[in-house]
Amino acid sequence: MMETTKRAEIDTTAPFRTVKEAVALFGERVLASQVYSNHLKVMHDEKWEDPSGIKIELQETRYDLKRAKEESIQMRNSLSCLKEELERTKQELQKLRVDPGVNETKLDETVFKTKFEVLVPRVDDEPIRSPRLRSMSEKRYVKFANPTGNNGSVFLERHPSMKKKEKKTKDKKKKSLIPLFIGGIFSKKKVLQ
């Protein structure tokens, strides 16, 4: 007897190209009813139960909108000021390019007319104008205590932690030479006779 096997074809193509198509065909309630049914009911009830909450939210959004408008007006004003300043500097630059000799002399005159002084207050609150006196008054001096000792010389010893470090480095150097010497002797291959 011959058994006949029937083949079933399975469609593996995507049923919808986008989620929008599925929602448009079946609707949001059918697709989301099983997953979000309780959550949607709670959200729906919360929205319509408390009208004062809606009023408060409306006031907050109005306040935020008003503040955003004020900030945008302030930004517009600052941008317009910056544009005006840019135009003025462009015009000044254009003038400098047209008559470079005339403006250089004017600039030099203004530099010579301005005088920069560093006023250093003295004890009697009279400013010092002489550069030599000013430099002398600005100097700072540090005095140290007299060193102790017979002839005025001071012997500085190493800090105890530094002494320990010196000992360790000497020990390490001695240890490092011994393994090199022994390793050199025993590393040679013995010749078989």
Swiss-Prot record:
Biased composition (Basic residues): 161-174
Claim: Coiled coil is one of the keywords in the record: yes
Coiled-coil annotated residue ranges, if any: 57-99
Domain of life: Eukaryota
Keywords from the UniProt entry: Coiled coil
The keyword Coiled coil is assigned to this record: yes
Disordered, as annotated region: 152-174
Residues that span the membrane, as ranges: none
Family, as annotated: Belongs to the WEB family.
Protein name in the entry: WEB family protein At1g75720
